[in-house]
Design a protein with these regions (language model features):
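N-terminal accessory segments
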Residues: 1-32, 61-64, 299-317, 408-409, ...
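FAD-binding subdomain of flavoenzyme oxidoreductases
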Residues: 96-251, 452
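C-terminal substrate-recognition/cap domain of FAD-linked oxidoreductases
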Residues: 20-29, 215, 226-229, 234-396, ...
Length: 459
């Protein structure tokens, strides 16, 4: 609960239309994609960087918790206010594209710009912003930076960190810093921008981002490989990726995911397949596209692919990617609640990871449909609970074993969803005591009063 003096300060600062403590607003900002609920004490919508600075300075002086928030589309509770405090939302006012520099192929944006809107705007200029998280129609670029979001095109084009050139950040004490430059090369000083990426709002509030753009490839084409065994599909991934061909995307659905999508949408997927790989290539000339697809088909078939279909028109392209993008919602047929995480391993370890998941599924009796970005080793595992009240504890134990399997294969707890609340307790699986202390010391140096998004990331 905020004291009256604090309420009055925030109202005076941003006005009554941009600061709220009523239950309707608190309820609207108490949850994210996890559906877990934590009621904040207030919600504030700063109109500019200076207001962010004044808000943080005041909150730091009065020890008021601040939880930065974009669209609330995260899967780990990173934007939830677990101990009251103030949700600072950038979605209402800080949503402008400030500059698109076609000469230097960069753009400056405010943190509340929606990813897909930004993609659409730069494409009007024949430019290209590759990071395309599944939440691209909802998630903000500030949130993408805070989580280091990836997407399907990461196999060729990388993830958010590969496109962040610079940013402006408001620190916990209200000071404003610049991190990075518009230049391609910059080795002057520490890489503070890199430190802020994936920090989940624990180190500062991002107020502006400078992003790298690419020229848009004029041609693209997709294909699907069908495999009887999921291990064959996983082997095909790393052997194809190491052959000299670099597809834009290399995605997979396992048998459970295929069946779920077909049951819901009837897109013509092979329901008896052990797995499918959906891939896309791009380029400048048709011969380049044809060569890449031929090479992929060759490597797929050398590793157990029983059918290889190339999309022949735009509708077939859309159907392939519709199936992949809607796998997450389709698997709800298997349970009332899902525990979904996104472990990542080196590509060559994908067969071993999926074998371990199958063993854990059998051990605990849960259906665990899997799909994801195999081109970068990122697998979305979904433990389906038919009776959440009875099975939740057992489900968490199963997920912990999946985390342990990923770590044992030199992988990580999360490739793109982040740590937030849901994976915070598992951080010691991936980091030793000295490493966790380093994280805490960095947090303490930048936020000594621990007002910025506390309790996240195990900090």
């Amino acid at each position: 609960m905020l004291e009256k003096q604090h309420i009055q300060y925030f109202k005076n600062l941003v006005g009554g239309e941009d600061f709220f403590t009523d239950l309707a607003h608190l309820n609207a900002y108490c949850y994210d994609a996890t559906k877990e609920r934590h009621l904040p004490s207030g919600v504030i919508f700063p109109r500019n960087e200076q207001e962010i600075s004044q808000i943080l300075k005041y909150c730091n002086e009065h020890r008021i918790i601040i939880v930065p928030r974009g669209a609330g589309s995260g899967f780990t509770g990173g934007a939830l206010s677990v101990s009251g405090g103030l949700v600072l939302s950038v979605e209402k006012h800080l949503d402008k594209i400030l500059e698109i520099d076609t000469k230097n192929l960069i753009a400056r944006v405010e943190p509340g710009v929606i990813n897909k809107h930004f993609q659409n705007e730069v494409e009007k200029l024949n430019l290209f912003y590759p990071p395309d998280p599944a939440s691209e129609n909802q998630s903000t670029l500030g949130g993408n930076v805070a989580e280091n979001a990836g997407g399907m095109r990461a196999a060729k084009y990388g993830i958010t960190k590969d496109y962040v050139m610079a940013m402006r950040v408001v620190l916990a004490n209200g000071e404003i810093i610049r991190a990075g430059k518009k230049t391609i090369k910059d080795v002057a000083g520490f890489n503070v921008a890199g430190l802020m990426i994936a920090s989940e709002g624990c180190l500062g509030v991002i107020s502006e981002i400078t992003l790298k753009l690419l020229a848009k490839p004029p041609l693209k084409q997709s294909a699907m490989g069908v495999f009887n065994h999921i291990e064959d599909a996983m082997n095909a991934v790393y052997k194809t990726m190491s052959s000299g061909v670099t597809p834009v995307a290399m995605e997979f659905l396992d048998n459970l995911s295929i069946k779920a999508v077909e049951e819901r949408f009837s897109k013509g997927l092979p329901k008896d397949a052990g797995a499918i790989l959906i891939t896309q290539v791009d380029g400048v000339v048709k011969e380049q596209i044809a060569w890449q697809l031929n090479e992929i088909e060759k490597h797929f078939k050398a590793n157990g692919c029983v059918d290889f279909k190339i999309a022949q028109n735009e509708q077939e392209e859309q159907d392939l990617w519709f199936s992949r993008r809607n796998a997450s919602q389709s698997i709800s047929v298997y349970g009332k609640k899902k525990l979904n995480e996104d472990v990542t391993v080196p590509r060559a370890s994908l067969p071993s990871l999926l074998q371990e998941v199958a063993k854990i599924s059998q051990k605990y009796g849960f259906k665990i449909p899997c799909f994801g970005h195999t081109g970068d080793g990122n697998v979305h595992v979904n433990i389906m609970l038919e009776d959440p009240k009875k099975d939740l504890e057992k489900g968490h134990k199963a997920m912990e074993e999946i985390f342990q399997a990923a770590i044992s294969l030199e992988g990580t707890l999360s490739g793109e969803h982040g740590i937030g609340l849901s994976k915070a307790k598992f951080m010691p699986l991936a980091f030793n005591h000295s490493e966790m202390e380093l994280f805490r010391n960095i947090k303490k140096a930048l936020d000594p009063n621990n007002i910025l998004n506390p309790f996240k990331m195990g900090l």
